[in-house]
Structures are given as C-alpha cells and as structure tokens.
Amino acid sequence: MVLIVQSSGYTLGMTSKPGRRVLPFPDRRAAGRMLAERLTEAVDLDLWSERTVVLGLPRGGVAVAREVAAVLGLPMDVIVTRKIGYPGQPELGVGAIAEGMREPVYDVRLTAQLGLSPADLAEVVAAERAELDRRVRIYRGGSPLPPVAGWCVIVVDDGLATGGTARAALRSLRTAQAAYLVLAAPVAPLSAAESLQAEADQVVIVATPSRFSSVGEWYLAFGQLTDADVLALLD
C-alpha cells in the first residue's frame, strides 16, 4: 500500500511550490484541480487504459470528483455512503454503510469503548439505509453501481476527517472485485490517511495539516450541496 502526500506539516497559507498557495483551498473545484494534478503524478493511469472510473462520495465529494474526472478525461459516477451515528448524537460517527454492501463497517474500537452492539444501532442503521436507497434513486434512478470488476476505481471525497465513509466505500468496491483502488482527497489528517492504507492500493492526499478539526476549515468556500447540486454535477 502506498501513501502519497505533499507534506504532513501544512498550515493555512503555506505553499507546495514557490508562489503557489495550497491551503486554504478556494473551493471544491479548485481543490479538485489540484487533486487531479497530484493523481497524474502518482497513479499510472496508462496502465488501465479505458478501464478507469472516478466515483465521488456525495455530496461534497462529487464536486471534487467532477473536476478530477474532467482534468483526467475519465468517466464519473457516485458511490453513495452514509455515516452511522451514535444514537441521539448523530455527529459522532461509529460506522458507515455503502451501496453494494449488506453490513455496516463499524469503528470496532469506538463501539467497544461505548459499549455498543449491532442491536443497539439497528434503528439508526435502518434509517441510514433508507436514506442511502433514497439517494441512489435520485442520483442513479435506483440502478446499481456500474460493474467495476477488473477496473481501476478512483474514490474521491472533499476531505477525510475519520475516513469512515471512505472505508465503507472501498470495502464495497473491493467486494465488487475492483482491480485497483485509489482513495483521493484534497485534505486529511495524516492519521486518517494512514489508517486507510490497508483498504486501498494507493491513498493520494494533497495536504495533511498537523492541526485538523474539520474538513471545512481548510476551504474558503465550503457550502453544503443539495441533491439538485449533485444531479447537476452528474449531468
């Protein structure tokens, strides 16, 4: 497994090259173009010929994926995931689900610390699965993911905080027999990027700031996207 990053010491306003500002990213589009440049350097796309696809994680990751796909000249789709939150405290993620997989992927250490069993989370999982199915119907008319067996798949998000939803997406795609998995994001804490090396063949991150509290802090413009926004990006 290969982890490719610019630096683990970026702070706001630092540059990767003389005169070039890296953080904060102006917006998701600019971050996507930067990420595409990094992917061009890091991944041997010629090896896969026409068997490469970019999959964005909704919603914000789709805006980044759109730029990556446009710059690299690749097809794009989405892979829908949902965070499994602690009951009554949904912002605390204890796992995630992704389309194409039957069971959630849990943060085993955290669920053990909290004393949670799958039965404790059954209601939350059911609600998130219903929302996942709703989004698949909206984004892809209810059709399943296109076949990825034997393909190189580049999974793109707008940033990784814990990496829980990305982990679920990667496991789903591995089960679907994707031949080569690349996880790509503009920004992530180094700990999250390293924790996902076992799930992907390559992890490509533009910047891994040493101080990290949220993805949004590393963007000047980080508005929430709607389902309509995602559909427009997929059009």
Name these PLM-found stretches:
Residues 1-235:
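PRPP-associated nucleotide enzymes
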